[in-house]
Curated annotation (Swiss-Prot):
SUPFAM superfamilies (UniProt xref): DNA repair protein MutS, domain I (SSF55271), DNA repair protein MutS, domain II (SSF53150), DNA repair protein MutS, domain III (SSF48334), P-loop containing nucleoside triphosphate hydrolases (SSF52540)
NCBIfam families found in the cross-reference section: mutS1, PRK05399.1
Record keywords: ATP-binding, DNA damage, DNA repair, DNA-binding, Nucleotide-binding
Record protein name field: DNA mismatch repair protein MutS
Chain residues that bind ATP: 613-620
GO-annotated cellular components: cytosol
CDD domains, per database record: ABC_MutS1
Source species of the chain: Vibrio campbellii (strain ATCC BAA-1116)
Length: 853
């Protein structure tokens, strides 16, 4: 006997469908429930906290089973998607009444974290991306797709560090990778990783898939034809999305190559340390996005976050944004635009559901409502003068045909789903109106029949009713059932009543049920035709969504600039940063005391600042605010300062704070040194580098030596604009030994055992660190502080007696370098070829090298 014949016909059907979807959970529709069996049931029981039961037996073994009600399935799907799980939805498509065996079923959709479009399964203000990654000869191809907007991009990071930064920037909900992928550590601690066959990443297959999607002969028009690694990833990605959506993807119409030299590159540590959209605790409070994001639409909010994570270098584009923000701000247009945008809502995601033919009736109603706002938006934006704003306003012009179609076709307040009808408006289709009239006339007829029968037969308790099982019936109480005439045919007996049918009522039942069925069939046909009528407008709606998103970000930044007293930065092509009265955009919003604004000056003659001062004095805040102001300027935003001149940057690096990376087995010091090495290898003269407390995780002299050598390398070999905060006061000698360096400090004033932080940046080095005063503020017991003061005095006396050993007096040439010069012996050895030497010559060379030691 074959294995499948040991199972019931229904379980055979289930196992066949499960074999087609082995890696994911299968929701198998049975009546009013979606059931899961075997390992799926066990897994779902744990993930969803639902009961695990057993259903009879199959092949002699009890079958583990779990289930969820069909009407509540969206909530369970949302939880599974959040956990990175994918689910195949299997529906009954056959008619149980006519099925001889198990009712026919098939998988109608696959819900995955990266391809969901249902409103209930998405975070409103965060992009939902699916990505694919490919690796060859140490380089990477990486493609991302936002199914909810059609935005399809690829990039080719050249190092693991760059690839890690891209993964953090895009934060895909689902990540596809080939079976032979080597750098699997890049995907650790991530949900939604999907292993795919290697052949899905083949270049020829990828090009074929992409040309088929875009309806093109080649990819030259997209400027991606030479990005072979990126195309391998993009090909796998588009095939996977087609397989899961099981429908055409008409809104995915282009692919863009994201050139890294067009952006200010932020590595993973920098994104984390600057707290752009996520704070160090993993939340969203007290982040730059929280301060800047007052967008009126969810799609504007998502675009602003993309800008924050990918600042750009094109000065012309940035100045266009700044001009636009300035014009909106000067006219206070944001007060008129915001209320309109709040009514428009999230048409970007409605568009995706429209393209995938999964839009619901209320999506159509929301799209109609958005279209109805466009004439008012056109009136408000008619005064805009800047070409960039005028172009956006043109794309946001009224779409009268679409608006008229939706106004005629969809009821004012349609139901949630089309299943029971009641969606298409009256007057839209004559045939539908006719069938509805027949169905709706049933109520009047039944009321008249009930009154006539009650009067004719003298039965006070007679009622005409309907239920889905027995259809129409006449109900009479048990006490008056003896008054029922002979032509009443009993249909059902209840505890206190009898139910009957008569030929006249049966004839009407057939007519009504037929008209309801016909009306629903016509309505569903009209619903599908509505998608066909809207499809030609897809590109226009896509352009509309993009234009409104951009206008929303610009008006939002104008409002923020006006409300928070930001200034317009001046963007320069040459390197340098000059800020007067700069403020930290986040700290100034959350502090209860007035924020102390500070200047900064970095130029070709002043490349590095050695920053000293007490803990809690504001060094890290000062450094971060400089980076945030520079970043805000590079997204085209006004900045928190009295004035700001920002030169073009290629990268921003931060080495601020560290903690043990337990998952990778790395200590705090190892994390610190790894980040430092990344900076020393990749920073350029056009980079902004923030270095905070290098070397504190090891012994004093090791730490001091590493800090000194790192600062020296940045100053002499790289020439990056650097803010170097330290507690090693020996480093304040560097500006006396090297050109283009300066000392600045944040001061504090002691009053007995207390300390007041001034938070103001002053030229020159700090006089002391105030560490003991800070320890007192933290609550360290007074006897411990007293003992520490005594020990400090002893150490200072020892230090004064051994000044010659202080690192601050050592010549620069003798300083430890992280990348040391080769010795004379090493250079001599490198010039010797052992294969060319006779035994006598080798012996002579050995004596010569010994003398050099």
């Amino acid at each position: 006997m074959k294995a499948e014949q040991k199972h019931t016909p229904m379980m055979q059907q289930y196992l066949k469908l499960k074999a087609e979807n082995p890696e994911i959970l299968l929701f198998y529709r049975m009546g009013d429930f979606y059931e899961l069996f075997y390992d799926d049931a066990k897994r779902a029981s744990q993930l969803l906290d639902i009961s695990l039961t057993k259903r009879g037996a199959s092949a002699g073994e009890p079958i583990p089973m779990a289930g969820v009600p069909f009407h509540a399935v969206e909530g369970y799907l949302a939880k599974l998607v959040q956990l990175g799980e994918s689910v195949a939805i299997c529906e009954q498509i056959g008619d149980p009444a006519t099925s001889k065996g198990p009712v026919e079923r098939k998988v109608v959709r696959i819900v995955t974290p990266g391809t969901v479009t249902d409103e209930a399964l998405l975070s409103e203000r965060i992009d939902n991306l699916i990505a694919a990654i490919y690796q060859h000869n140490g380089k990477f191809g990486y493609a991302t797709l936002d199914v909810t907007s059609g935005r399809f991009q690829l990039v080719e990071p050249e190092t693991e560090e760059a690839m890690a930064a891209e993964l953090q920037r895009t934060a895909p909900r689902e990540l596809l990778f080939p079976e032979d992928f080597e750098a699997v550590h890049l995907m650790s601690n991530r949900n939604g990783n999907r292993r795919r066959p290697v052949w899905e990443f083949e270049l020829d297959t990828a090009k074929q898939q992409l040309n088929q999607q875009f309806g093109t002969r080649d990819l030259v028009g997209f400027g991606v034809e030479h990005a072979s690694l990126g195309l391998c990833a993009a090909g796998c990605l588009i095939q996977y999305v087609k397989d899961t959506q099981r429908t055409a993807l008409p809104h995915i119409r282009s692919l863009t190559f994201d050139r890294q030299d067009h952006s200010v590159i932020l590595d993973a540590a920098t994104r984390r340390n600057l707290e752009l959209t996520q704070n160090l605790s993993g939340g969203t409070d007290n982040t730059l996005a929280e301060v800047l994001d007052h967008c009126a639409t969810p799609m504007g909010s998502r675009m602003l976050k993309r800008w924050l994570h990918q600042p750009m270098r094109c000065v012309d584009t940035l100045n266009n944004r700044l001009d636009a923000i300035g014009e909106i701000k000067d006219q206070s247009l944001f007060t008129d635009i915001q209320p309109i945008f709040k009514q428009i809502g999230d048409i970007e995601r409605i568009l995706a559901r429209l393209a995938l033919r999964s839009a619901r009736p209320r999506d159509m109603a929301r799209l109609r409502h958005a279209m109805q706002q466009l004439p008012e938006l056109e009136a408000v934006t008619s005064s805009l003068a800047h070409p960039y704003l005028k172009k956006l306003a043109q794309f946001a012009a009224p779409m009268d045909e679409v608006c008229d179609l939706l106004e005629r076709a969809i009821k004012e307040n349609p139901p949630v789903v089309i299943r029971e009808g009641g969606v298409i408006a009256e007057g839209y289709n004559a045939e539908l109106d006719e069938w509805r009239k027949l169905a709706d006339g049933a109520t009047e007829y039944l009321e008249k029949l009930e009154a006539d029968e009650r009067e004719r037969h003298g039965i006070d308790t007679l009622k005409v009713g309907y239920n889905a099982v027995h259809g129409f019936f006449i109900q009479v109480s048990r006490g008056q059932s003896h008054l029922v005439p002979p032509h009443y045919v009993r249909r059902q007996t209840l505890k206190n009543a009898e139910r009957y049918i008569i030929p006249e009522l049966k004839e009407h039942e057939d007519k009504v049920l037929n008209s309801k069925s016909k009306a629903l069939a016509v309505e569903k046909k009209l619903w599908e035709e509505l998608f066909d009528l809207l499809m030609p407008n897809l590109e226009k709606i896509q352009n509309l969504a993009s234009a409104i998103s951009q206008l929303d970000v610009l008006q939002n930044l104008a409002e923020r600039a006006d409300s928070l007293d930001y200034c317009r930065p001046t963007l320069n092509k040459e390197a340098g940063i000059s800020i007067q009265a700069g403020r930290h955009p986040v700290v100034e919003q959350v502090t209860s005391e007035p924020f102390i604004a500070n200047p900064i000056e970095l130029s070709s003659n002043r490349k590095m600042l050695i920053i000293t001062g007490p803990n809690m004095g504001g060094k890290s805040t000062y450094m971060r605010q400089t980076a945030l102001i520079a970043l805000m300027a590079h997204i085209g935003s006004y900045v928190p300062a009295e004035s700001a001149h920002i030169g073009s940057l290629d990268r921003i690096f931060t080495r601020i704070g560290a903690s043990d990376d337990l998952a990778s087995g790395r200590s705090t010091f190892m994390v610190e040194m790894t980040e430092t090495a990344n900076i020393l290898h990749n920073a350029t003269k056009n980079s902004l580098v923030l270095m905070d407390e290098i070397g504190r995780g090891t012994s004093t002299y090791d730490g001091l030596s590493l800090a000194w050598a790192s600062a020296e390398w940045l100053a002499t070999q790289i020439g990056a604009m650097t803010l170097f905060a330290t507690h090693y006061f020996e480093l304040t000698e560097l500006p006396n030994l090297l050109p283009n360096l300066a000392n600045v400090h944040l001061d504090a004033v002691e009053h007995g055992d207390s300390i007041a932080f001034m938070h103001a940046v002053q030229e020159g080095a700090a006089s002391k660190s105030y560490g003991l005063a800070v320890a007192g503020l933290a609550g360290v017991p007074k006897p411990v502080i007293k003992n520490a003061r005594n020990k400090l005095s002893q150490l200072e006396q020892l230090g004064q007696g051994n000044d010659s050993a202080r690192p601050s007096t050592v010549d620069v040439a003798n300083q430890l370098s992280l990348i040391p010069e080769p010795s004379d012996v090493e250079q001599a050895l490198s010039n010797i070829d052992p294969d060319d030497l006779t035994p006598r010559q080798a012996l002579e060379e050995l004596y010569r090298l010994k003398k050099m030691l």
